């Protein structure tokens, strides 16, 4: 509403794959219908508000998590003001390697220091060898109490959670399609 772009680019999280068969039917859905259902975000902000945190002593990892926490708190206030029951979800993607385990532990510690834990149901972990509060029944409802989901790549395709509002990535981009799917 504030910005009046000359061009709007819309994309799908599902890549176009060549089919060897014509045994499928095509369904056309208007973009406005998909946006109205909350399946597509109206805007994507990259590193929003990072420059507003002015404590030089914070390491970059803590800085990024603090920015995500602040943005989430801002969204919570806006949803409450609009009488909405949406509880915004922060997705935190960590690397696959051993570094990922270190990142997970550091993130869990940062959240725990703010009183946000797996035990109180506000943190979910979705990794191959560790699954806490991660069922779709727990994560997807708009009013779910889970506020933060730590994952590697388990949710890359076919997972729909309209309340997912913020994505924090600590992992390198290795595939453009994977990147589009994750953001989508």
Question: What do the predicted segments below correspond to?
Answer:
Residues 2-4, 37, 82-84, 140-144, ...:
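Conserved catalytic network of the ASCE P-loop NTPase/AAA+ motor domain
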Residues 14-18, 36, 96-98, 155-157, ...:
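Conserved nucleotide-binding/hydrolysis micro-motifs of P-loop NTPases
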Residues 77-80, 137-138, 154-156:
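Generic recognition of flexible, low-complexity loop/linker segments
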Residues 23-126:
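Conserved interdomain linker/interface between the two RecA-like ATPase lobes of SF2 helicase motors
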Residues 121-152:
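Conserved helicase ATPase core of P-loop NTP-dependent helicases/translocases
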Residues 4-7, 87-89, 118-123, 145-146, ...:
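Loop/turn elements at helix/coil->beta-strand transitions in domains of secreted/extracellular proteins
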Residues 148-151, 155-173, 177-183:
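A short beta-strand element within the Helicase C-terminal
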Residues 2-22, 38:
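Conserved helicase ATPase motor motifs in RecA-like P-loop NTPase domains
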